[in-house]
Amino acid sequence: MASPFSGALQLTDLDDFIGPSQECIKPVKVEKRAGSGVAKIRIEDDGSYFQINQDGGTRRLEKAKVSLNDCLACSGCITSAETVLITQQSHEELKKVLDANKMAAPSQQRLVVVSVSPQSRASLAARFQLNPTDTARKLTSFFKKIGVHFVFDTAFSRHFSLLESQREFVRRFRGQADCRQALPLLASACPGWICYAEKTHGSFILPHISTARSPQQVMGSLVKDFFAQQQHLTPDKIYHVTVMPCYDKKLEASRPDFFNQEHQTRDVDCVLTTGEVFRLLEEEGVSLPDLEPAPLDSLCSGASAEEPTSHRGGGSGGYLEHVFRHAARELFGIHVAEVTYKPLRNKDFQEVTLEKEGQVLLHFAMAYGFRNIQNLVQRLKRGRCPYHYVEVMACPSGCLNGGGQLQAPDRPSRELLQHVERLYGMVRAEAPEDAPGVQELYTHWLQGTDSECAGRLLHTQYHAVEKASTGLGIRW
């Protein structure tokens, strides 16, 4: 069966795609008891283990478990985490929480919040032959029907991710004379790309990656910090689910950087792919078109929720286009009406330039898919990368073609993708600078655009992963 993870995770190198029987190890501390002596281990027919002590007593032994955090901290395989993901982050986990809420007293219930990505919404719209707005409203109706309390649109959190990316680029561009690694700035919204960079190129590439959080993780901050305050709840009393086009987002949500130690909770508790939401609809016996639409929820009073919104610049969030327009205006006083893309070797590697009187002022690129990412990294290593900014996505054709999106067996994949792209483009685009509620939250929640609070809640950091060298890794 083909892995649902992005190519950048599957193809890091030959040693990065191995079975857990060879190098999947977890160091554990074994407590030695004084005078315990030698013990035997008995294996039962059901596979359970029992320790038999010298005095004849027995003790059931727990099986060692490798968690998703262990996988992320390891330099071996990533795809062997798939079985862990299915149990830790799946629609079954959401159903367990909803069922527990039904049985619990009101004071013991958790507030369940679902945040839906625009890419997933477009994929579901294509499957059910709906327009994106009806899909958003009917999906809200479905989630509330099964016990979810609030349903948000991650296009709102993407406003913050785009704005922080814009500011970071301008700051780095102005400071490039003082820092060799200031540019190029590489987009950070794709977790498949981030995992690949951390595991394969480590400290060389990480300084180039934008520290701005992805829309999913900004939404995690919004829900578990701002919204929790509004609801007079601690973060652990909220169960936050996101609906994403990509399995790699499950890995992102599980990063230790997005775990609240004080309240022992993650910013995003569970990530469902578009396909998992479709299975949930099937299991509940619900046809999305048959549902009555429900009004969309908004995170704050200043944000409109009458219809879903999106951003210009393609189905992966529009990072290149928004950063390009902002930089042209902020750095050179040039208003860019239309961004013109120049395809290079393939449609997944394109360039954008800003020129004035024959001089190139800005040189941007987008690199989608593992092949183009490898080429980009090699050019960086050779010191021959001409770009100031690169929008990097692990999936060919970007997020609308993510591994978690719905497929149509009776329809060519290219034709389906084009249809999903058209539906995605039907949604009204909104400039993040002008989006209702955004400036209000910067002022009252984050205490300003460049505050310590904004840095803590809207940015993150990356960690180079050293490859472990073990005898098991020897190829005889």
Curated annotation (Swiss-Prot):
Swiss-Prot/TrEMBL GO biological process terms: hematopoietic progenitor cell differentiation; intracellular oxygen homeostasis; iron-sulfur cluster assembly; regulation of gene expression; response to hypoxia
Entries under InterPro entries matching the protein: Cytosolic_Fe-S_CAF, Fe_hydrogenase, Fe_hydrogenase_lsu_C, Fe_hydrogenase_ssu
Residues noted as binding [4Fe-4S] cluster 1 in the record, renumbered to the chain: 24, 71, 74, 77
SMART domains: Fe_hyd_SSU
List of residues binding [4Fe-4S] cluster 2: 190, 246, 395, 399
A Pfam entry, by short name: Fe_hyd_SSU
A cellular component term, taken from the record's GO annotations: cytosolic [4Fe-4S] assembly targeting complex
Entry keyword annotation includes Iron-sulfur: yes
Residues that bear N-acetylalanine: 2
Example GO molecular function: 4 iron, 4 sulfur cluster binding
Tissue expression profile of the protein: Widely expressed.
Keywords annotated in UniProt: 4Fe-4S, Acetylation, Iron, Iron-sulfur, Metal-binding
Top-rank lineage group of the source organism: Eukaryota
Assembly and binders: External component of the CIA complex. In the CIA complex, interacts directly with CIAO1 and MMS19.
Family stated for the protein in its record: Belongs to the NARF family.
Function: Component of the cytosolic iron-sulfur protein assembly (CIA) complex, a multiprotein complex that mediates the incorporation of iron-sulfur cluster into extramitochondrial Fe/S proteins. Seems to negatively regulate the level of HIF1A expression, although this effect could be indirect.
Annotated protein name in UniProt: Cytosolic iron-sulfur assembly component 3
Gene that specifies this protein: CIAO3
